[in-house]
Amino acid sequence: MSYGLTGTSSKLRGTSSIFSWTQVRHFSRRRIAYPFYPFKKLGRQHPKKHDTNLKTAMRQFLGPKNYKGEYVMNKYFTVPTNHVPNYIKPDLERGQSLEHPVTKKPLQLRYDGTLGPPPVENKRLQNIFKDRLLQPFPSNPHCKTNYVLSPQLKQSIFEEITVEGLSAQQVSQKYGLKIPRVEAIVKLVSVENSWNRRNRVSSDLKTMDETLYRMFPVFDSDASFKRENLSEIPVPQKTLASRFLTIAESEPFGPVDAAHVLELEPAVETLRNLSTVGEHSSGHQQSTNKNTKVIYGELVEGERSQYKFTNAKVGKVGYRYGSGNRDNKKDRRIGFNKLGQMVYI
């Protein structure tokens, strides 16, 4: 609510001007975003007790505290351990976020301040679709949680590529995983094995790994609905802007012509390039058949890093003296490569 002044003036014959001012109140169009479900609102209270209905609704949602200051009766307090994410679902629970910490039965805060079972059983929380459980944002049904891989599956992928000599394309088609993800699994498993040999995996890392693994759903290659779309092409950055082109009515215009207008390669070439990504792909040896000279420095005892020197062409590396370098700037330009990954330009 704001205040303003409005004035009028009048002038009588033979007299000076007369001004009249009136104070007017202007109401703001903004409305407080109260919860859409019913909750206990504040009544008459002491003027010095500065409390709001939003704070009251928040306390009703969180529930009572224990002696440690933790909201143990809130269903979102504990970390899930059954590979089912526990995302907030306000459109289904409608304020019923409390449950017994032992029996897991729903509770509701009554108007007299006591806790008890809800008078009406919420049937929305009984028959929930599986896709709804994987939705982290209630208002965005298109965003779904990805599936994590079990340690046994990651070890199998690592052995099939490094020991049996299979290519990344063969493993990708077998398990229904994208080639960049298969390459990342091989790299991460090799790093994890090297850390285990050196005893560099602490107990905190193991605890965090087990906790995150139990929080998210597990990937199953036998289930067809869990397999990834291997023919999916990342959206190029140049297609996000509109392009207008005037052509004749009888002139043919297809996807290849659209790719030329947008300065993009056809989808067939993009899929072919995506299939050769990674050092374990079938076409990697043919694409990198050039001999490169590498010189390794002497590894001093006690050090974990080793210098590596490779040949470089002048003008291809480094920055020219006097040229602008925006590596440390906040507004550095960001682009996207063929895989859809963000890269600095």
UniProtKB/Swiss-Prot annotation:
Keywords, comma-separated and alphabetical: Mitochondrion, Ribonucleoprotein, Ribosomal protein, Transit peptide
Pfam assignment, any one: Bot1p
Gene Ontology process terms (BP): mitochondrial translation
Subcellular location: Mitochondrion
Record GO terms (molecular function): structural constituent of ribosome
Cellular compartments per GO CC: mitochondrial inner membrane; mitochondrial small ribosomal subunit; mitochondrion
Superkingdom in the source lineage: Eukaryota
Residue runs in coiled coils: none
Transit peptide: 1-27
Transmembrane segment boundaries: none
Keyword Ribonucleoprotein included in the entry's annotation: yes
Function: Component of the mitochondrial ribosome (mitoribosome), a dedicated translation machinery responsible for the synthesis of mitochondrial genome-encoded proteins, including at least some of the essential transmembrane subunits of the mitochondrial respiratory chain. The mitoribosomes are attached to the mitochondrial inner membrane and translation products are cotranslationally integrated into the membrane.
UniProt miscellaneous comment: Present with 3460 molecules/cell in log phase SD medium.
Subunit: Component of the mitochondrial small ribosomal subunit (mt-SSU). Mature yeast 74S mitochondrial ribosomes consist of a small (37S) and a large (54S) subunit. The 37S small subunit contains a 15S ribosomal RNA (15S mt-rRNA) and 34 different proteins. The 54S large subunit contains a 21S rRNA (21S mt-rRNA) and 46 different proteins.
Family affiliation: Belongs to the mitochondrion-specific ribosomal protein mS45 family.
Name this polypeptide is given: Small ribosomal subunit protein mS45
Lineage summary: Eukaryota, Fungi, Dikarya, Ascomycota, Saccharomycotina
